[in-house]
Design a protein with these regions (language model features):
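Conserved HGGG/HGGXW glycine-rich cap/lid loop of the alpha/beta-hydrolase fold
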Residues: 1-36
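The conserved beta1-alpha1 loop
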Residues: 3-7, 56, 177
């Protein structure tokens, strides 16, 4: 089974446009997290009985760490718009401070204001108004306290980087990024050059969320990758 893992402020349904395009030979499940801490969400993934993990952004970071913690549980991993972490100490400290500031603000604000701020991020500037509107109900269904806890326990500054560990990951790994997302395109290529059985794929006409902007292209990349894994 393919387990689709959502990003921050998403429900599993955000993956539906891609999941519905996978062939029947790859049944899937869209994960709706009941837990809102890093360890809680990692536990959900590890107990899911999935053989393939597909995660976006935060979901990708979770997928990598699940695979590293229990590599024998999985046959392949796909990460989209994700990274193995921030290595530079000063940058990590800055990110922790920024995430804590945001978490404190989130705890004090209504979800409507939180979503409005989230949607104004430069990272999502290339997404169409229609795409943003389609994602909004899932974002508005989030609980602010849960979002704050997730930031504090699973933020990029909080989590230790796992670049070194990736060198020993004995699993097929596909790292996907949008061509308009320079930072995560670079991260995908680095993942591909670090893990021994990894490859990168850059999706044209897409930014940080290629699975939303180009779902058919992402579904095709995942299908080809899983076919290659199945064929040895």
């Amino acid at each position: 089974m393919v387990l689709f893992i959502p990003g921050f402020m998403q429900r599993g349904d955000a993956w539906r446009p891609v999941a519905e395009l996978l062939p029947e030979r790859y049944p899937s499940r869209l994960l709706d997290h009941a837990e809102h801490s890093f360890e809680g969400r990692l536990g959900e993934i590890l107990s899911s009985s999935a053989s393939v993990l597909v995660g976006y952004s935060l979901g990708g970071r979770l997928a990598l760490r699940a695979a590293l913690r229990s590599p024998d549980s999985f046959t392949a991993v796909v990460v989209v718009g994700s990274t193995a972490g921030i290595e530079e100490g000063p940058l990590r400290v800055q990110r922790v401070e920024a995430d804590e500031k945001l978490a404190s603000w989130i705890e004090a604000m209504p979800i409507e204001d939180i979503v409005a701020l989230w949607e104004r991020q430069p990272l999502f500037a290339d997404q169409s108004d229609l795409l943003v509107e389609e994602q909004r109900p899932g974002r508005l269904s989030q609980d602010p306290r849960s979002l704050a806890l997730l930031l504090r326990t699973a933020g990029q500054g909080t989590l230790d980087p796992v670049w070194h560990e990736l060198r020993t990951l004995d699993l097929p790994l596909l790292a996907i990024a949008g061509a308009r997302d320079d930072g995560y395109s670079a991260a995908a290529k680095r993942i591909a050059s670090t893990a021994p059985h990894a490859r990168a794929a850059i999706v044209e006409e897409a930014g940080h969320a290629p699975q939303l902007q180009q779902p058919a292209a992402v579904a095709e990349l995942i299908t080809r990758f899983l076919d290659d894994v199945a064929n040895g």
